[in-house]
Amino acid sequence: MSSHSQEPVGEENFDDSEYDRPSKSQVKREMHALLDLGKELVELSPERLRQLPLEERLYEAIREAQRTTGREGRRRQIHFVGKLMRSAPAEAIRAQLDTWRNGSREETAAMHRLEALRERLLKDDDALTAVLQRNPDADIQHLRALIRAARKEAAANAALSQGQEPQRKQYRALFQALKNLSA
């Protein structure tokens, strides 16, 4: 027999008001996330860093980490950046980094859509009608002239012998006109 009495441990006896703070593991995960964010910031150019909402001390610590060449010194400086990140607006910084990453994807997708539209315009006259319906203020004569010139250029390029450089001037001009329409 044991000399001390034990109360049964059950949910009815559990008082969670003492444990309203995050667990130690959760705090460590958050600190590692801030450290990783700090590592990302160290990889940015000074121009990009200036666009972020960083305190002067954090900015200088990041610049110092960028200048540090020794492996251990750089690691320690990055950890210092991670420590300073605790008081930084991490969500605003993450949002800006995501915008930079995904913005370029969106731009690339828009360029691909314009290239596909250009190809449709060169192959099918009905595609021009669709473009004009979406952009009623477009200069019809200018677009038709660009399409004719690009088609003529493509026909001339098809007749080139091996090794000759194809002309792409009208092809690019049509793309620029479509890009200006979408802007």
Swiss-Prot record:
Start-end of Acidic residues biased regions: 9-18
Record-linked CDD domains: YjgA-like
Keyword check for Coiled coil: no
Signal sequence coordinates: none
UniProt keyword Cytoplasm, yes or no: yes
The entry's keywords: Cytoplasm, Ribosome biogenesis, RNA-binding, rRNA-binding
GO cellular component: cytosol
Highest taxon above the source species: Bacteria
Subcellular localization(s) per the UniProt record: Cytoplasm
Pfam families the record matches: DarP (PF04751)
SUPFAM superfamilies: PSPTO4464-like
Chain segments carrying region Disordered: 1-27
GO MF, one annotated term: rRNA binding
Main localization of the protein described in the UniProt heading: cytoplasm
Gene Ontology biological process terms from the UniProt entry: assembly of large subunit precursor of preribosome
InterPro entries linked: DarP, DarP_sf
PANTHER family: UPF0307 PROTEIN YJGA
Role description: Member of a network of 50S ribosomal subunit biogenesis factors which assembles along the 30S-50S interface, preventing incorrect 23S rRNA structures from forming. Promotes peptidyl transferase center (PTC) maturation.
Family: Belongs to the DarP family.
The protein, known as: Dual-action ribosomal maturation protein DarP
